[in-house]
Design a protein with these regions (language model features):
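Conserved "Asn-ladder"/turn position within leucine-rich repeats
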Residues: 62, 86, 108-109, 130-131, ...
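Leucine-rich solenoid repeat scaffolds
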Residues: 201-239
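Canonical leucine-rich repeat
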Residues: 67-70, 89-95, 111-117, 133-139, ...
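Extracellular beta-strand solenoid repeats
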Residues: 58, 82, 93, 104, ...
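Extracellular beta-strand solenoids
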Residues: 51-53, 59, 76-77, 83, ...
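LRR N-terminal entry segment and analogous cap-like coil->beta motifs
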Residues: 31-101, 105, 144-145, 165-167
Length: 239
């Protein structure tokens, strides 16, 4: 099984010149990005070249187990970063530290942790349908417009989620959730925890929701009054 950048490596990498390694990086990157890419002049203290992009980066739909190798790491991506539908991916280590728009790691069925995810995402973060994910630990501390962890059937807790979302937050169809402990404290848009078949408590729900609040079709037969006890919701409440 191949790692993401295996095509850049050989058994005698240490003997290659900086120019040779950079040329191989550039050749590979032609298929993954748009916009302007910058490669550091020299490797960092860990021996890796630092690569940034002003545009989008996509490694989706690939048979990869890791986003890292001994050649280079992403630092900042100005657009979107896609690593969704990589069913063998087990870690987000090596992902950019910052992403200007959206970060997608949806439907990565072997992903068990969000450790290594960007610290800051300007647009939004989506890990929809990651069936082996049990925790949100390692999720971005800032996810500007939205955060989606819906369809993560093994997710047992929302601990690790950003505590403030300007837009929407969705954890619907997370079949192992029993409470909302760890959810953001403030959601500017819509909050969805509907169709969570094990959810029996609204404890931990956001204190403020600027849009709608959905908690229908859960194990607990919640009422509008139940929601109002735990959250100040400006929009429609659907139980």
């Amino acid at each position: 099984m191949k790692t993401l950048y295996e095509s850049l490596l050989d058994d005698d990498l240490i003997t290659k010149t900086d120019k040779m390694i950079k040329d191989e990086i550039k050749l590979f990157l032609k298929e993954t990005y748009n916009g302007v890419v910058k490669i550091s002049k020299k490797p960092n203290a860990d021996g890796k070249y630092e690569v940034s992009s002003t545009g989008n980066v996509s490694v989706k739909n690939r048979d990869i187990i890791s986003l890292t190798n001994g050649t280079f790491i992403w630092t900042v991506v100005g657009g979107d970063f896609y690593c969704n539908n990589c069913n063998s991916l087990t870690s987000l280590e090596g992902a950019p530290e910052k992403v200007g728009k959206y970060f997608y790691c949806d439907n990565c069925n072997s992903l068990t942790s969000l450790e290594g995810a960007p610290e800051k995402v300007g647009g939004g973060f989506s890990c929809y349908g990651c069936g082996s994910l049990e925790s949100l630990k390692g999720a971005p501390k800032e996810a500007g417009e939205a955060f989606y962890c819906s369809g993560c059937k093994s997710l047992k807790t929302l601990k690790g989620a950003p505590q403030m979302i300007n837009g929407g937050f969705s954890c619907h169809t997370c079949n192992s959730l029993t409470s909302l402990e760890g959810a953001p404290k403030k959601v500017g848009g819509t909050f969805c925890c509907d169709m969570c078949i094990s959810l029996i408590s609204l404890e931990g729900a956001p204190k403020e929701v600027g849009g709608r609040f959905y908690c229908n079709n859960c194990a607990g037969k919640f009422t509008i009054e139940d929601v109002k006890k735990v959250s100040n919701v400006k929009g429609e409440i659907k139980c």
